[in-house]
From Swiss-Prot:
Descriptive protein name: Type VI secretion system spike protein VgrG1a
Lineage, opening ranks: Bacteria, Pseudomonadati, Pseudomonadota, Gammaproteobacteria, Pseudomonadales
Assembly behavior: Forms homotrimers. Part of the type VI secretion system (T6SS). Interacts with EagT6 and Tse6; these interactions are required for Tse6 loading onto VgrG1. Interacts with Hcp1.
GO CC annotation terms, alphabetical: extracellular region; type VI protein secretion system complex
Signal peptide: none
Length: 643
């Protein structure tokens, strides 16, 4: 039934089940094609579900008997009112990348170029009908995020940024996506290297030709300047500029944008070039209408026979529209009356083609939380900038380890040149992540929060008046291993508490002052060493008591002066020496010896009495008993409480 027709249908339901009555199609470089098919069938009960998602193709007869194919996936089908003995159906054919508009994800790609990312997305979704015709190297992205967007939007915006576009090569059983970035990816189809222009009044219809021509030129910006910032080279100048000159009066209007999404100037130069080429690709467009069955988007051809000689040149087809109408099948008239017409949107083949960015870039509207991650067995994982890695709650693909994200900078209270504050978030902690310009590719940690697993250091709300900072020893620290500075603001019980888990070093480069309004209690578990470079003065308003459990030694290179207003009393066991304010000196003991290696003198201004057998007037009562001293010393060092 179709053999004599201009266009034939090949569908999953079998030969001649569906017949083409009319087709409208649109193709465009870097965009998805759509072919709207108006079909008829002798069967009014076709199962539409057996068409959806299945491949279907049309074959268009070309001059000389060869055929051109339009192949796609049935994205939509419907049954409509028929005509006579035929039921009516409609189907929309889309390319296989259209199926990427039906799936979305949140995932992270690291250390890959955009072509590598695109191919990975295709393969992960089970597609292999693509071809790489790219001509230049592409930079490696350290970090690239697909965030709450379809897989198609994700790869589309990346291609728009990198200056990549695509088109489709059709075969009978498949269509192939061709990744392109330059003239070399395109060819002229067989028999169509040159296509003539015939004015419609001449009526030449013996070969494919154009019969209508339009050319338009439009003012576009003449230059684009981009800028960005690299924190690893904060003083680097990253501003780049690209321009394309045009010979008209308004050709030099500049564009400026920030951020340019790069940290290397050569990448910025390429991005600026891509964008100005995309803009300037709109400067001149030629639209040709005719009967040219073999040419579509992505093809090259040379126009001939047009009255304006400068337009007889080589063109790249950047867009194509097709209209096919076939005679009603009820007439039985075969292919008579079938019509084909196309409109081609073209640019000069010497002009670079780029896509204007039109795919929405996802914006993270507000901060998120994430969990700090790192290698197994580590508690802190950071780099030389104090950056950490995190697992985002939306990322279902990572393994929550050191490969989960890029290194992310952490906001600190101060950040000076070799000075400031530093608290590195630790593995397992929950942090607040913001995004520069809302860009999911540019995260920055701005805070930290507690949760049911990472709980607060003080029992709440009972201790709501307490604030401070409490750390944890690492590696292998337990809740008993920490440093802490804590403030208690409860009225009447205010306190500043400082706990050092091991050592505490205080360095004062000038003066230090300590003032205690009431009591001060000082306890040292082992030794104390005090070095005083000049003088020391100590004043005690009332009593001063010193208890020494062992020996005490005082060494003085000069004068050792001891003064007492009432009495100096030295007691050792049963020996007592008293120095009284009235000048009386009393010495008492069970015996005494006076030794001199030289002469000895006793001078007295009054009488000198030497008595034997008399009782001592000075006793050893008081604190001179060793057992009493030992007891008092031990009382100052009670044993630690058990349990």
């Amino acid at each position: 039934m179709q053999l004599t027709r201009l266009v034939q249908v090949d569908c999953p339901l079998g030969p001649d089940v569906l017949l083409l009555q009319r087709m409208e199609g649109r193709e465009e470089l870097g965009r998805l094609f759509a072919y709207e098919l108006h079909l008829v069938s002798e069967n009014p009960n076709l199962p539409l579900e057996q068409l959806l998602g299945k491949p279907m193709s049309l074959s268009l007869e070309l001059p000389g008997g060869s055929r051109r194919f339009f192949h796609g996936i049935v994205a939509r089908c419907s049954q409509v009112a028929g005509h006579g003995q035929f039921a009516g159906y409609q189907a929309t054919l889309r390319p296989w990348p259209w199926l990427l508009t039906r799936t979305s994800d949140c995932r992270i790609f690291q250390n890959q170029s955009v072509p590598e990312i695109i191919k990975q997305v295709f393969r992960n979704l089970g597609f292999s009908d693509f071809e790489d015709a790219l001509t230049r190297p592409y930079r490696e992205w350290e970090y690239c995020v697909q965030y709450r967007e379809t897989s198609f939007d994700f790869i589309s915006r990346l291609m728009e940024q990198e200056g990549i576009y695509y088109w489709f090569r059709h075969e009978q059983k498949r269509h192939i996506l061709v990744l392109s970035d330059a003239y070399g990816a395109h060819r002229s189809p067989g028999g169509y290297a040159s296509v003539p222009y015939y004015p419609p009044t001449l009526g030449h219809r013996e070969r494919d030709h154009f019969f209508d021509w339009q050319m338009a030129r439009e003012v576009q910006p003449g230059s684009l300047t981009l800028n960005d910032y690299d924190f690893q080279r904060p003083g680097a100048r990253l501003e780049v500029r690209s321009n394309i000159a045009r010979p008209h009066a308004a050709a030099d209007y500049p564009l400026y944008d920030y951020p340019g999404e790069y940290v290397q100037s050569q990448d910025g130069e390429q991005y600026a070039r891509n964008r100005i080429e995309a803009i300037q690709a709109q400067h001149e467009r030629v639209r040709l209408r005719g009967v040219v069955r073999g040419i579509g988007a992505g093809h090259l051809f040379r126009l001939s026979g047009y009255p304006r000689d400068d337009q007889n040149r080589e063109y790249l087809v950047v867009g194509a529209e097709y209209r096919v109408v076939q005679e009603l099948y009820e007439t039985g008239s075969g292919g008579a009356g079938s019509q084909f017409e196309s409109e081609l949107d073209c640019i000069d083949a010497s002009q670079s083609f780029r896509l204007l960015p039109q795919t929405p870039v996802p914006v993270v509207r507000g901060p998120q939380t994430a969990v700090v991650v790192g290698p197994k067995g580590e508690e802190i994982w950071t780099d030389q900038y104090g950056r950490v890695k995190v697992h985002f709650h939306w990322d279902r693909h990572d393994q929550s380890n050191e490969n989960s994200s890029c290194w992310i900078r952490v906001s600190q209270a101060w950040a000076g040149k070799n000075w400031g504050s530093m608290q590195i978030p630790r593995i397992g902690q929950e942090v607040i992540v913001s995004f520069l310009e809302g860009d999911p590719d540019r995260p920055i940690i701005t805070g930290r929060v507690y949760n049911a697993e990472q709980t607060v250091p003080y029992e709440l709300p009972a201790n709501a008046t307490q604030s401070g900072m409490k750390s944890r020893s690492s590696k292998g620290g337990t809740p008993a291993n920490f440093n802490e500075i804590r403030m208690e603001d409860k009225k009447g019980a205010e306190q500043l508490y400082i706990h050092a888990e091991r050592n505490q070093d205080n360095l004062v480069e000038n003066d230090a002052s300590l003032s205690v309004g009431h009591d001060r209690n000082k306890s040292i578990g082992h030794d104390e060493l005090a070095r005083i470079g000049n003088n020391r003065t100590r004043a005690v308003k009332l009593n001063d008591t010193l208890l020494v459990g062992g020996a005490k030694s005082d060494s003085v290179t000069g004068t050792y002066l001891i003064e007492a207003g009432a009495q100096i009393r030295l007691v050792c066991g049963k020996s007592v020496v008293e120095f009284n304010a009235d000048g009386t000196i009393n010495i008492s003991g069970s015996a005494f010896n006076l030794y001199a290696s030289g002469n000895g003198n006793i001078d007295t201004g009054g009488r000198l009495d030497l008595n034997s057998g008399g009782a001592s007037e000075v006793d050893a009562k008081g604190k001179g008993v060793q057992g009493t001293i030992d007891g008092q010393v031990q009382a100052m060092f009670p044993p630690p409480a058990k349990g």
